[in-house]
Amino acid sequence: MTAPFLQVEGLSKRFGDHQAVADLSFTLARGAMLALLGPSGSGKTTTLRMLAGFEQLDAGRILVEGRDVTPLGPAARRFGMVFQHYALFPHLSVFENVAFGLSKDADRASRVAEVLRLVDLAGFESRSIGQLSGGQQQRVALARALAPEPRLLFLDEPLSNLDPSLRERTRAELRAALKQIGITTILVTHEQEEAFALGDLVAVLKDGRLQQLGTPTELYEHPQNQFVATFVGRASALPGTITAPGRVRVGDVDWPTAGSATGAVTTVVRPEDVVFTDSGLPGTVVERRYLGGRALFRVSTAAGTLEIEAPMASAELEAKVHVTARRSLSFNRDSV
């Protein structure tokens, strides 16, 4: 079995009485992209700073290709970093910004040209930073981080300064460039859509603790607890009872479910998991939101409030409705 490229073991960090990161462990294969996802204060940035060597660990160790790099400073670790606000030098040209961390030898110009081609900025060498758009500045920051050929790349909220219309296109460009280079990458974000678009794996953090690590599909389809279910995508959490293998009772009706727990559970219902029907769990539409070709409904039931995404053709239905599951639902084992 191939050894992991990056091995993180038991990272912990406390600031006074606040436990910022607690016993965090994971592994990452060479060339993989990991997104650290969580709300503000979940420990994402502290984790990134510990990995980069900017923050001292209280406990744990970091191994790269089997070598313990924990005692090394940031420069000796040979990791690259793209900061949230890019930290570009406005008085320097694009070339000078990208070349800033390179030794002044004969290969300097060719290396700058190479990384600018990778980020689709060939020919921009003489431009000033002020002449660039936000997306172009982000790519200059990426080129500068890649120029010294780091072993590992860190991205701290890399797209947060871009407007929504530019962000989606830049995500695709960023992922394509990093996959072409084949560099192992860890990024921090608080946006689920960004984590799913960029990460091969996503680590969900809350209060400094790892809640779940998996592919975007695994996190969305099989959340391990209620926090992950409701933080990753839209979801309604309703009390339920497992009545038989593969069946969960929500309100007065039985719905299909995945898993083998028994007794009281919290049932996780995605907006696309349920549909309007002629019979099933009765409810009342309390809110409608239009989403272009589809609509999002909030339906009050005896078991709790559900969100349902349905075609616009459903928008004219009466307030009194019935809903039923269209596929197996997820649940966690926390007793309600």
Predicted segments with their positions:
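Conserved ABC transporter NBD signature motif
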Residues: G60-D68
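Conserved coupling/switch loops of ABC nucleotide-binding domains, chiefly the family-specific signature
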Residues: D58-R61, D207
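Helix-to-loop junction immediately C-terminal to a conserved catalytic motif
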Residues: A52
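The feature captures the beta-strand-to-loop junction immediately N-terminal to the Walker
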Residues: L37-P39
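Non-catalytic connector elements of ABC transporters
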Residues: A235, G246-V336
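ABC ATPase nucleotide-binding domains
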Residues: A76-G80, Q84, L88-F227
